[in-house]
C-alpha cells in the first residue's frame, strides 16, 4: 500500500478511536441519568476534564514519552467505559471523567505526532474525528434502539475499542525518519507532494529554558505571559468568539433543549413505528446532528465560508426556534425538528472547519501553529459554558411541559 495512504489510514483511525467514546457517552446521556436529571450533567463530566487537560498539558506533556501516553490512553478509556457500563450513576460519572481525560491527552498526543509526518497525517486525523461523531452516535442507536441490546452491554462493547491505540507502535519505524534534531540543525521531511524538503528543527523546551536561565524566573514568566496574551488578543474577535458561540448554542440545543423535544408515541401517530421509547427520539437527534457535522467538516475543500459570525447568528436562531418549540409545542411533526437538528449539525461542522481554514489562509506563517492551537480551545470553552447553563435549562423546560400536559420528557 502507498505509504501516504497508510499514514492517512492510521491517523484516521486514531482520530476515530480518540473521539468516538466522547460521542457515545453523550448519546447515552439519557440512559445514564434517566429522564428526570438534566443531560448536561453528562456533558459537563464529558468535557470539563478534557478541557482542563488541554489547559495544563503544555507545561508538562513534552516530558512524557509517547509510548507511556498511549498505554495511559488504553488504560484510562478502557477502564473508564467499564465503569460507565456499571449502571450506577456515581460510578458512571467517574468512568466518564477517566474517558474525558483520555480524550484530552489523546488529542494533544496525536496532533503532536502529526509533526513527524507529512500533512497527510493531520488530514487523516481531522477526518477521523469527524467520522467518530457519526460512527459513535449511529452505532449506539443501532445497538440500543434497533437491535435492542441492553444499554449496559452496549457500553461494555465500546470498552474494547481503545485496544486499537496499539496501532501506534507500528508507527515507530516510520517515525524515525522525522525525528527532530537539536535546535539550529536541519532535518529532512516530506511535503504534501511526497518530495523531500529541508526544514529547520524547532527549538526545544531545553533551549528555551537555557535562554531564561540568566534572568529571574518570575520576570521571565511575566514576560512570557504578556507575550502570549498579546498573541491571543488578535485571535479573539475574528476566530475565537464566533467558534465558541456556535458551540455554545449547539450544545445548549443538544443537551439542554433536545431532551425536551419529545412527541407522543402511540398508535395512529407518525412516530409509533419509528420510535418505541421516548429515549429513542433523543438518540436519533444525536445521530442526525453528528451526520450534519460529518458532512460539513468534510466539505471545507469546496464550500468556503468567510463570515464566521453569520454561522453564529444562524445557530442562535436555531436555538431560539427550538426553545419556542419546547415551550409552546408549535410544531407537531418530529420530521421538521429532525431536519432542524441536521441543519444545526451542518452549521456546527461548517464553523469548525472554516475557522481553521481561515486561520491557515489569513494568519502569517510564523504565527500559524500557535494560532491553530490557541483557537482549538474555543469549541471546548463554548461547550463547557453550555453544560453549566443546560443543567438549569432542561429542568425548567421539562417542568413547564409537565404542567401543560406534556409529560413525555419524564418518560422513558
Swiss-Prot record:
Biological process, per Gene Ontology: L-arginine transmembrane transport; lysine transport; regulation of intracellular pH
Membrane topology qualifier: Multi-pass membrane protein
SUPFAM superfamilies in alphabetical order: MFS general substrate transporter
Keyword Magnesium in annotation: no
Subcellular location: Vacuole membrane
Disulfide links within the chain: none
Subcellular location, principal: membrane
Pfam families registered for this protein in UniProt: CLN3 (PF02487)
Signal peptide: 1-29
Any one annotated GO CC term: fungal-type vacuole
Swiss-Prot/TrEMBL keywords: Amino-acid transport, Membrane, Signal, Transmembrane, Transmembrane helix, Transport, Vacuole
Matching InterPro entries: Battenin_disease_Cln3, Battenin_disease_Cln3_subgr, MFS_trans_sf
Spans traversing the lipid bilayer: 41-61, 70-90, 91-111, 131-151, 154-174, 234-254, 281-300, 307-329, 334-356
Family of this protein: Belongs to the battenin family.
Function according to Swiss-Prot or TrEMBL: Involved in vacuolar transport and vacuole pH homeostasis. Also required for cytokinesis.
Name of the molecule in the record: Protein BTN1
Organism: Eremothecium gossypii (strain ATCC 10895 / CBS 109.51 / FGSC 9923 / NRRL Y-1056)
Amino acid at each position: 500500500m502507498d505509504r501516504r495512504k497508510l499514514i492517512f489510514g492510521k491517523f484516521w483511525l486514531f482520530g476515530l478511536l480518540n473521539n468516538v467514546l466522547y460521542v457515545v457517552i453523550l448519546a447515552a446521556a439519557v440512559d445514564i441519568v434517566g429522564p428526570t436529571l438534566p443531560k448536561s450533567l453528562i456533558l459537563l463530566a464529558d468535557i470539563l476534564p478534557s478541557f482542563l487537560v488541554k489547559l495544563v498539558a503544555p507545561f508538562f506533556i513534552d516530558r512524557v514519552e509517547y509510548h507511556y501516553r498511549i498505554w495511559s490512553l488504553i488504560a484510562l478509556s478502557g477502564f473508564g467505559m467499564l465503569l460507565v457500563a456499571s449502571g450506577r450513576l456515581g460510578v458512571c460519572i467517574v468512568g466518564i471523567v477517566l474517558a474525558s481525560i483520555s480524550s484530552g491527552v489523546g488529542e494533544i498526543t496525536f496532533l503532536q505526532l502529526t509533526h513527524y509526518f507529512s500533512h497527510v497525517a493531520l488530514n487523516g486525523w481531522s477526518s477521523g474525528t469527524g467520522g467518530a461523531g457519526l460512527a459513535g452516535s449511529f452505532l449506539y442507536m443501532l445497538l440500543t434502539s434497533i437491535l435492542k441490546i441492553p444499554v449496559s452491554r452496549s457500553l461494555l462493547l465500546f470498552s474494547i475499542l481503545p485496544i486499537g491505540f496499539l496501532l501506534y507502535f507500528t508507527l515507530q519505524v516510520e517515525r524515525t525518519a522525522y525525528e527532530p534534531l537539536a535546535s539550529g540543525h536541519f532535518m529532512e521531511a516530506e511535503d504534501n507532494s511526497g518530495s523531500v524538503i529541508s526544514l529547520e528543527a524547532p527549538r526545544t523546551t531545553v533551549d528555551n529554558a537555557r535562554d531564561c536561565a540568566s534572568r529571574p524566573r518570575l520576570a521571565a514568566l511575566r514576560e512570557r505571559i504578556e507575550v502570549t496574551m498579546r498573541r491571543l488578543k488578535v485571535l479573539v474577535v475574528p476566530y475565537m468568539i464566533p467558534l465558541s458561540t456556535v458551540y455554545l448554542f449547539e450544545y445548549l440545543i443538544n443537551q439542554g433543549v433536545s431532551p425536551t423535544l419529545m412527541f407522543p408515541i402511540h398508535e395512529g401517530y407518525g412516530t409509533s413505528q419509528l420510535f418505541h421509547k421516548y429515549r429513542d427520539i433523543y438518540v436519533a437527534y444525536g445521530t442526525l446532528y453528528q451526520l450534519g457535522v460529518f458532512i460539513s467538516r468534510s466539505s471545507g475543500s469546496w464550500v468556503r465560508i468567510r463570515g464566521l459570525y453569520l454561522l453564529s447568528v444562524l445557530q442562535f436562531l436555531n436555538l431560539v426556534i427550538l426553545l419556542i418549540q419546547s415551550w409552546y409545542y408549535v410544531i407537531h411533526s418530529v420530521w421538521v425538528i429532525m431536519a432542524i437538528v441536521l441543519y444545526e449539525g451542518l452549521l456546527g461542522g461548517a464553523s469548525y472547519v472554516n475557522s481553521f481554514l481561515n486561520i491557515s489562509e489569513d494568519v502569517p506563517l510564523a504565527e500559524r501553529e500557535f494560532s491553530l492551537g490557541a483557537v482549538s480551545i474555543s469549541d471546548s470553552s463554548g461547550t463547557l459554558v453550555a453544560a453549566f447553563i443546560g443543567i438549569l435549562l432542561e429542568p425548567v423546560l421539562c417542568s413547564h411541559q409537565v404542567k401543560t400536559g406534556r409529560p413525555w420528557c419524564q418518560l422513558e
